[in-house]
C-alpha cells in the first residue's frame, strides 16, 4: 500500500487567481476540469460568472484550484421544500425557525469547480478547501449565506 503524507501540518495560502498565475503545469487528471481551468476559467472570471482561487504551498506551487459563485436553494415543489425544511430544522436555532420556514429561497455559496493537482491528491487538500469555504462563509457578513452547494462530477 502506498504511504501518503497528509498536508495538515503544511502551510497553504488561498488567493484569488491572478493574471500572473501560470496554470499550464496544473493538471488534476479529470479532462472536464482540466479543460475548464486551461480554456474557460479566464472568460468566466471576466464576465463574473465565478471567482477563482488557488491553493499554493510555501514554494508558490499551485496545488488546487476552485471557483465560488453566489447561489440559492430553490424548490420546484412544496413537498420538496417541506422535506428540506424538516431536515434542516435540527440545525437551525429555535428563534429563527418560523422565519426560516417562510423563506421561498435559501441563500448559498456554490463551489462550482474544485480540482486538486494529480500528484498531491488524497492528501487532505480538498478537505482543506472545504473547511476554508465553510469557515469563511460562517463568518461572512457581506451578504446572506445559509448553505454551501457543490457542483460535483460523478467520477
Feature map (PLM): residue ranges:
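Conserved acyl-donor/pantetheine-binding loop and adjacent beta-alpha core of acyl/acetyltransferases
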Residues: 67-113
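Short hydrophobic/aromatic beta-strand element in the GNAT-like acyltransferase core
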Residues: 50-54, 65, 108, 113, ...
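A short helix-loop-beta-strand connector motif used in the catalytic cores of GNAT acetyltransferases and
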Residues: 42-54, 61-64, 70-79
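A short, internal acetyl-CoA/4′-phosphopantetheine-binding micro-motif in the GNAT/acyltransferase core
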Residues: 112-122
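Hotspots on structured nucleic-acid-binding interfaces, especially in canonical RNA/DNA-binding domains
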Residues: 30-40
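Conserved acetyl-CoA-binding loop-helix of GNAT-fold acetyltransferases
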Residues: 122-135
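Conserved N-terminal entry element of GNAT/NAT acetyltransferase domains
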Residues: 1-29
Amino acid at each position: 500500500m502506498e504511504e501518503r503524507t497528509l498536508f495538515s501540518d503544511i502551510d497553504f495560502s488561498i488567493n484569488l487567481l491572478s493574471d500572473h498565475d501560470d496554470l499550464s503545469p496544473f493538471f488534476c487528471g479529470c479532462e472536464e476540469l482540466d479543460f475548464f481551468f486551461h480554456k474557460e476559467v479566464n472568460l468566466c472570471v471576466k464576465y463574473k460568472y465565478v471567482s477563482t482561487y488557488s491553493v499554493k504551498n510555501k514554494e508558490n506551487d499551485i496545488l488546487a484550484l476552485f471557483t465560488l459563485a453566489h447561489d440559492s436553494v430553490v424548490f420546484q415543489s412544496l413537498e420538496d421544500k417541506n422535506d428540506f425544511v424538516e431536515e434542516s430544522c435540527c440545525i437551525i436555532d429555535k428563534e429563527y425557525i418560523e422565519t426560516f420556514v417562510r423563506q421561498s429561497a435559501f441563500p448559498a455559496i456554490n463551489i462550482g469547480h474544485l480540482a486538486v493537482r494529480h500528484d498531491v491528491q488524497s492528501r487532505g487538500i480538498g478537505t482543506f478547501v472545504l473547511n476554508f469555504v465553510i469557515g469563511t462563509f460562517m463568518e461572512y457578513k457581506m451578504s446572506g449565506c445559509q448553505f454551501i452547494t457543490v457542483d460535483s462530477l460523478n467520477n
